[in-house]
Amino acid sequence: MKTKQKIFFAKIIYRLIRIFFPKKIRVKRRGIEWSLNLSEAIDLHIFVFGSFEIKITNVAKKLHLEKYNQIIDIGANFGVQSLQFAKNFTNSKIYSVEPTNYAFNKFIKNLELNQKLSRNIHPFQIFLGSKEKAIPTSIYSSWN
């Protein structure tokens, strides 16, 4: 399916859901509590399908990531992969890196909703890069 078609269907789904549900909602999907904003694509996907990029978690299971005691989630966004990893790899420590204020604050809120899972997640609001230089005062996500 082409991107334009996906966007078209997402708009229809969003409009239908908004008839019955508020824009901001707290839900439980696949054993994880989420604070979602249904006007955002990833949030809407989790609300409708229960997860986002579940293929990453499935590949991690096939690679037997549980035998490793540390997982690094770079570009953690609001914790989608970190929380799924914590749920599936209970003996691993997850180090999550997210530079943007908006996503990081949302990540912290989702960790607070998942106290048991958050014990193994260590969030860091930092930038990773190949050069040492000053960090801009305002940082925006490309999708925000």
What do the PLM-derived regions correspond to, one by one?
Residues M1-N144:
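Phosphate/nucleotide-binding beta-alpha loop and adjacent structural elements of enzyme active sites
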